[in-house]
Amino acid sequence: MRVWAVANQKGGVGKTTSSIALAGLLAEAGKRVVVVDLDPHGSMTSYFGYDPDSLEHSNYDLFLHKGSVPQGLPGQLLLSTSDERISLLPSSTALATLERQSPGQSGLGLVIAKSLAQLWQDFDYAIIDSPPLLGVLMVNALAASQQLVIPVQTEHLAVKGLERMVNTLAMINRSRKQALPFSIVPTLFDRRTQASMHTLRVLRDKFPEEIWQGYIPVDTRLRDASRAGVTPSQFDGKSRGVLAYRALLKHLLAQQLVAQVA
């Protein structure tokens, strides 16, 4: 199983949409995908019609065992989605309490990695929707992953947030055997605005090697898919947003192949 994290230390950049869009396209290609909602706000969980405040069980259960994960527990927590090839490991608001509980508890940074290790025979891909704050949850997402997607909204405050994320990644990489490859993905691009055009140029100038040369445009069909509770490609496989995500997926698969060869 390949594990991808979608993360940025800034909210509202399209993390959840990107996670679900990529999962939907992988499922369309016949892959089995587990999507992991690690954001206490539960946007991914809500997307598929579940209420993070009322779920009896969630991935918070995985963190209740001081770093060990009981055999079989991850599989018991999985929920169905709009696509039979996509399963959801849901979030709950209780995840927000982990940051207060985590000091002094060893092993909490590897809970998701250990959980996904139990599911590797059942899925081809795992996609983790990370919270926007650096803490035990983001550390879990990055520690479990072999590849990182960093969505960046094309607006003037985005570059600062991206720089913080890149610095965080450098810190995480010091404890990894291999550096985590990443792709910067410009999102919510609107060619009609100077802000989008300027930010895209700045991102390409500052991160020429790391940035994907395409972009995800503003597309109301992506919002409509969310309202319908289905993946963007299920809702409208030929929308501008989905076509952009198809190109992004092709780029990520090529990057994955390079990493595997290396």
Enumerate the language-model features and the residues they cover.
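P-loop NTP-binding core
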Residues: 1-262
